[in-house]
Amino acid sequence: MRPLSIKPTSLDVARHATSVESFGNHRPPISPWHSPVPYLFGGLAAMLGLIAFALLILACSYWRLSTSGDDSGERVDEEKESRSGVKAASAACEEKVLVIMAGDDLPRFLATPAANKCMCGHEGRMVIFKEDGIGAGEEKMGDREKAKENEETTSQ
Protein backbone atom coordinates (compact mmCIF):
# COMPACT_ATOMS: atom_id res chain seq x y z
CA MET A 1 0.00 0.00 0.00
CA ARG A 2 1.06 3.40 -0.66
CA PRO A 3 1.14 5.96 2.15
CA LEU A 4 -1.22 8.92 1.99
CA SER A 5 0.36 12.24 1.60
CA ILE A 6 -1.34 14.94 3.61
CA LYS A 7 -0.42 18.50 3.03
CA PRO A 8 0.45 20.44 6.14
CA THR A 9 -2.13 23.13 5.38
CA SER A 10 -5.05 20.71 5.28
CA LEU A 11 -3.85 19.15 8.54
CA ASP A 12 -3.88 22.53 10.24
CA VAL A 13 -7.41 23.18 9.00
CA ALA A 14 -8.56 19.84 10.38
CA ARG A 15 -7.00 20.56 13.76
CA HIS A 16 -8.54 24.01 13.88
CA ALA A 17 -12.02 22.64 13.07
CA THR A 18 -11.91 20.04 15.84
CA SER A 19 -10.28 22.10 18.53
CA VAL A 20 -12.15 22.88 21.74
CA GLU A 21 -11.54 26.57 21.44
CA SER A 22 -13.52 26.83 18.20
CA PHE A 23 -16.65 25.34 19.82
CA GLY A 24 -16.64 27.97 22.54
CA ASN A 25 -16.55 30.86 20.10
CA HIS A 26 -19.07 29.61 17.53
CA ARG A 27 -22.40 28.08 18.51
CA PRO A 28 -24.63 26.35 16.01
CA PRO A 29 -27.44 28.64 14.81
CA ILE A 30 -30.69 28.29 16.76
CA SER A 31 -33.70 27.69 14.55
CA PRO A 32 -36.71 29.95 15.20
CA TRP A 33 -38.96 26.88 14.85
CA HIS A 34 -37.77 25.53 18.21
CA SER A 35 -39.91 28.19 19.90
CA PRO A 36 -43.74 27.98 20.26
CA VAL A 37 -44.21 31.62 19.20
CA PRO A 38 -44.19 31.06 15.40
CA TYR A 39 -46.65 28.18 15.79
CA LEU A 40 -48.92 30.36 17.93
CA PHE A 41 -49.00 33.24 15.47
CA GLY A 42 -49.26 30.86 12.52
CA GLY A 43 -52.29 29.16 14.09
CA LEU A 44 -53.93 32.50 14.85
CA ALA A 45 -53.34 33.68 11.30
CA ALA A 46 -54.82 30.47 9.90
CA MET A 47 -57.94 30.78 12.10
CA LEU A 48 -58.46 34.43 11.19
CA GLY A 49 -58.05 33.55 7.53
CA LEU A 50 -60.64 30.79 7.85
CA ILE A 51 -63.10 33.13 9.60
CA ALA A 52 -62.61 35.77 6.91
CA PHE A 53 -63.18 33.17 4.19
CA ALA A 54 -66.40 31.97 5.87
CA LEU A 55 -67.69 35.54 6.21
CA LEU A 56 -66.90 36.17 2.56
CA ILE A 57 -68.88 33.10 1.54
CA LEU A 58 -71.83 34.16 3.72
CA ALA A 59 -71.80 37.67 2.28
CA CYS A 60 -71.69 36.35 -1.29
CA SER A 61 -74.53 33.89 -0.69
CA TYR A 62 -76.67 36.60 0.93
CA TRP A 63 -75.95 38.93 -1.98
CA ARG A 64 -76.81 36.21 -4.49
CA LEU A 65 -80.12 35.43 -2.74
CA SER A 66 -81.12 39.08 -2.53
CA THR A 67 -80.37 39.75 -6.20
CA SER A 68 -81.90 36.52 -7.50
CA GLY A 69 -85.32 37.53 -6.13
CA ASP A 70 -85.40 40.64 -8.34
CA ASP A 71 -84.98 38.77 -11.61
CA SER A 72 -87.40 35.90 -10.97
CA GLY A 73 -91.16 35.94 -11.32
CA GLU A 74 -91.79 36.88 -7.72
CA ARG A 75 -93.20 40.26 -8.72
CA VAL A 76 -96.01 38.58 -10.64
CA ASP A 77 -96.81 36.39 -7.63
CA GLU A 78 -96.82 39.40 -5.31
CA GLU A 79 -99.23 41.25 -7.60
CA LYS A 80 -101.59 38.26 -7.64
CA GLU A 81 -101.42 37.97 -3.84
CA SER A 82 -102.05 41.67 -3.34
CA ARG A 83 -105.10 41.49 -5.63
CA SER A 84 -106.54 38.52 -3.75
CA GLY A 85 -105.79 40.08 -0.36
CA VAL A 86 -103.56 37.26 0.83
CA LYS A 87 -100.28 38.41 2.32
CA ALA A 88 -97.04 36.52 1.90
CA ALA A 89 -96.20 37.19 5.54
CA SER A 90 -98.99 34.92 6.75
CA ALA A 91 -97.60 32.05 4.69
CA ALA A 92 -94.11 32.71 5.99
CA CYS A 93 -95.29 32.71 9.61
CA GLU A 94 -96.89 29.30 9.30
CA GLU A 95 -94.77 27.02 11.42
CA LYS A 96 -93.98 23.46 10.38
CA VAL A 97 -92.48 20.75 12.60
CA LEU A 98 -90.73 17.61 11.42
CA VAL A 99 -92.29 14.54 13.05
CA ILE A 100 -90.42 11.24 12.92
CA MET A 101 -92.61 8.18 13.45
CA ALA A 102 -91.19 4.73 14.10
CA GLY A 103 -92.00 1.62 12.11
CA ASP A 104 -93.04 2.97 8.70
CA ASP A 105 -91.12 2.89 5.44
CA LEU A 106 -91.12 6.68 5.23
CA PRO A 107 -91.48 7.77 8.85
CA ARG A 108 -91.06 11.53 8.30
CA PHE A 109 -93.98 13.94 8.17
CA LEU A 110 -94.42 17.70 8.30
CA ALA A 111 -96.95 18.79 10.90
CA THR A 112 -98.47 22.11 11.80
CA PRO A 113 -98.56 22.54 15.57
CA ALA A 114 -101.96 23.10 17.14
CA ALA A 115 -102.49 26.12 19.33
CA ASN A 116 -102.34 25.03 22.94
CA LYS A 117 -103.56 28.31 24.35
CA CYS A 118 -106.86 30.06 23.81
CA MET A 119 -106.32 33.55 22.46
CA CYS A 120 -109.87 34.73 23.16
CA GLY A 121 -109.70 34.72 26.97
CA HIS A 122 -112.17 31.86 27.49
CA GLU A 123 -109.63 29.18 28.31
CA GLY A 124 -111.08 25.72 28.83
CA ARG A 125 -114.56 26.74 27.66
CA MET A 126 -116.28 26.82 24.31
CA VAL A 127 -118.24 29.97 23.64
CA ILE A 128 -121.42 29.57 21.57
CA PHE A 129 -123.16 32.67 20.29
CA LYS A 130 -126.78 32.50 19.27
CA GLU A 131 -127.80 33.96 15.93
CA ASP A 132 -130.45 36.25 17.36
CA GLY A 133 -127.86 37.86 19.64
CA ILE A 134 -129.96 37.50 22.81
CA GLY A 135 -127.33 35.69 24.83
CA ALA A 136 -124.30 33.51 24.82
CA GLY A 137 -123.78 30.21 26.54
CA GLU A 138 -120.46 28.89 27.82
CA GLU A 139 -119.76 25.21 28.24
CA LYS A 140 -116.81 23.07 29.20
CA MET A 141 -114.68 21.55 26.46
CA GLY A 142 -115.65 18.07 27.68
CA ASP A 143 -119.34 18.71 26.84
CA ARG A 144 -118.91 18.79 23.06
CA GLU A 145 -122.08 16.81 22.48
CA LYS A 146 -124.18 19.44 24.23
CA ALA A 147 -122.49 22.14 22.20
CA LYS A 148 -123.32 20.32 18.96
CA GLU A 149 -126.96 19.99 20.05
CA ASN A 150 -127.10 23.70 20.88
CA GLU A 151 -125.69 24.56 17.46
CA GLU A 152 -128.29 22.36 15.77
CA THR A 153 -131.15 23.94 17.71
CA THR A 154 -129.96 27.48 17.02
CA SER A 155 -129.52 26.81 13.30
CA GLN A 156 -133.14 25.49 12.94
Swiss-Prot record:
Segments on the Cytoplasmic side according to the record's topology features: 61-156
Annotated region described as Disordered, given as residue ranges: 67-87, 136-156
Keyword field: Amino-acid transport, Membrane, Transmembrane, Transmembrane helix, Transport
Any one Gene Ontology BP term: regulation of amino acid export
Tagged with keyword Coiled coil: no
Extracellular-side positions: 1-39
Membrane-spanning ranges: 40-60
Tissue distribution: Expressed in the vascular tissues, even in the minor veins of the leaves.
Compartments it resides in: Membrane
Membrane disposition: Single-pass membrane protein
Domain of life: Eukaryota
Bias kind Basic and acidic residues: ranges: 72-84
UniProt keyword Ion transport present: no
Motif VIMAG, residue numbers: 99-103
Gene Ontology cellular component terms for the protein in this record: membrane
Note in the entry: Overexpression of GLUTAMINE DUMPER 4 leads to free amino acid levels accumulation.
Notes on the domains: The VIMAG motif is necessary for the function of the protein.
Family of this protein: Belongs to the GLUTAMINE DUMPER 1 (TC 9.B.60) family.
Role according to the record: Probable subunit of an amino acid transporter involved in the regulation of the amino acid metabolism. Stimulates amino acid export by activating nonselective amino acid facilitators.
Protein name according to UniProt: Protein GLUTAMINE DUMPER 4
Gene that encodes the chain: GDU4
